[in-house]
Amino acid sequence: MEGQRTQRRGYLKDKATVSNLVEEEMENGMDGEEEDGGDEDKRKKVMERVRGPSTDRVPSRLCQVDRCTVNLTEAKQYYRRHRVCEVHAKASAATVAGVRQRFCQQCSRFHELPEFDEAKRSCRRRLAGHNERRRKISGDSFGEGSGRRGFSGQLIQTQERNRVDRKLPMTNSSFKRPQIR
């Protein structure tokens, strides 16, 4: 979470820097260039000077796998965002930048093949985190807010209570044993 905040601050700082540069360039009159077209044209020229040509910002509409020519303009948003076609997102291996890799479903990016267990679709790192969260055992994990529902959850709750009951000594002074005569 802290990393996201830091990244966001950095992004906002960069964005503010670009805004300041644009305003500064506009105030200076583009360093003696002639004004032909108004504020909007001027702003575009300044933005191009600050950020670089707009062609650098246009994302590729093709799958990033080597020699794949699938056009992603009609693909689902997920595939466009990650620049991978549906076939290569589910493939056991693909060549990206000359290296054999597999698309990780958890990270939504390509990893080298040794980072996966056998035919798994998630890298070891993300899979380990997922399994850790699944197996986490704490007092809160069996409460109402847990993801466990139904009979098996009730059975686990009962087993946990029995374990606790067996460990508690019977030293309560208000407890009276029934006497059989």
Swiss-Prot record:
Residues 1-10 have a biased composition (Basic residues). One of its GO terms (cellular component) is cytoplasm. The keyword Cell membrane does not apply. The keyword Methyltransferase does not apply. It is found in: Nucleus; Cytoplasm. Residues 22-39 have a biased composition (Acidic residues). Its main location: nucleus. Its cofactor is Zn(2+). GO terms for biological process: regulation of DNA-templated transcription; regulation of vegetative phase change. Zn(2+) 1 binds at residues 63, 68, 85, 88. Zn(2+) 2 binds at residues 104, 107, 111, 123. Residues 170-181 have a biased composition (Polar residues). Keywords: Cytoplasm, DNA-binding, Metal-binding, Nucleus, Transcription, Transcription regulation, Zinc, Zinc-finger. Binds 2 Zn(2+) ions per subunit. It comes from the Eukaryota. Expressed in the inflorescence apical meristem and young flowers. Induction: Negatively regulated by microRNAs miR156. A zinc finger (SBP-type) spans 60-137. The SBP-type zinc finger is required for the binding to DNA. This is Squamosa promoter-binding-like protein 5. It comes from Arabidopsis thaliana.
